Every structure is written in structure tokens, then in C-alpha cells.
């Protein structure tokens, strides 16, 4: 088991898919949306569509902390299409840190946010093994490709011969895609 091999503290939650569908239907009905009859493709993929400048980053950060409180999730990857957006998300987290600490620290939630870089790929070990909420911001290009083109897919001596992507996989992170339409 990869989770045990890397010593990962990962997300773990077993929910009945019928319960998830019922919750989705309640949310859709409450918001005047078309109510789904089934989970699309049986997957647990959910979209929140918001116009630029309407607080998207705040909404998904707040969602991260609510998932941490309600379900004890601690691993989150924010996947973005460009370095500029990655830096913008990092800045937003830094600027909103005190706000989120005021809201969630009383509930026992502390968090770390970091940017993935191939230059410091070994930092995924800290992400994987920490018991705090971990938010890792990375570009889609940092994971596209293979061992010939991306460090994340290369085995590393400092990671016990594993690849950085193995550490991320072991945590079963919630992946939030910011501007997915720009990642194709």
C-alpha cells in the first residue's frame, strides 16, 4: 500500500453514493437548478462555475476549510493553468490567511499552503505526512508529461526511490481545478 509506504496522512471518507446523490439533489433543488437523476458517469466530480472577479478563489478556499471541519480532509491540490494564476492564488491565500485562521482555528484547523516546484520536489513528503490541512498549488504543466519531461514523474533518492507524484497519490487529495477551461 503506497499510503503506508510513504507514511502519508491522507484523505479518507467512505460515503454511500446514494447519500451523495441525495445531497447533490437537495443543493440543486434549493438553488433552482436542474436536479440530476444520477451522478454523472458515477464520478464524484463537481463543478462550481463563477464569473471572473466574483470571489471564486475565496469560495474554493472556504470549501477547503469546510471539508476539513466536516470530513477531516487535510490534503488539497489547487491545479491552475499558468504560473501567473498560481502566483495569484498564493498571494490570495497569504492575504486571506488571517481571515481563515480567525474562522477555523477555533475549530482546531491549522493549515500550510505551498507552491509545487520541480526544483524542490522533495517537499511533497512534508505535504504527504503532515497532519495539518495542506494546500498545494501547482500548474497543470508541472504534472503533464512523463519521466522524460517532468520531475514529478521521476524517482528521487531523497524520496526513498519514489516519485513525487507517488506521494501526492498516496494522500488521495481533493483536487480543485481553477480555470479548467484553460488547461486543455
Q: Across the structure, where does each feature detected by a protein language model lie?
A:
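RecA-like P-loop NTPase motor core of helicase/translocase proteins
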Residues: 1-184
